[in-house]
Amino acid sequence: MTLVMGFCCGRFCDAKNKNKNKNKNKNKNKNKKEDVEEGREGCYNYKNLNDLDESEARVEFGPLYMINEEKSDINTLDIKRRYRHTIESVYF
């Protein structure tokens, strides 16, 4: 199991869409289903707690998710759509 933390909704921020809508904020929080399904490179606000350095002593916790690595691809994580059935939420 891997512990990751971040926002409760994965925000897909494809570089192409980010540059296209740079000055327009109307589509900034929309996840594009086509982008996620095609496996395009995206970025999410998640940190793997197993990879944190010891120097990062202060961590601000949001919801934590336990993800079964055998069933999920951590690089294309889309919590709302793809991994609803494999996630257990832990709140502090």
From Swiss-Prot:
Induction: Expressed in the early phase of the viral replicative cycle. The keyword Repeat applies. Sequence repeats lie at residues 16-17, 18-19, 20-21, 22-23, 24-25, 26-27, 28-29, 30-31. Residues 19-31 have a biased composition (Basic residues). The keyword Repeat applies. Keywords: Early protein, Repeat. Residues 16-31 are annotated as: 8 X 2 AA tandem repeats of K-N. It comes from the Viruses. Residues 19-38 are annotated as: Disordered. Belongs to the orthopoxvirus OPG051 family. This is Protein OPG051. The lineage of its organism: Viruses, Varidnaviria, Bamfordvirae, Nucleocytoviricota, Pokkesviricetes.
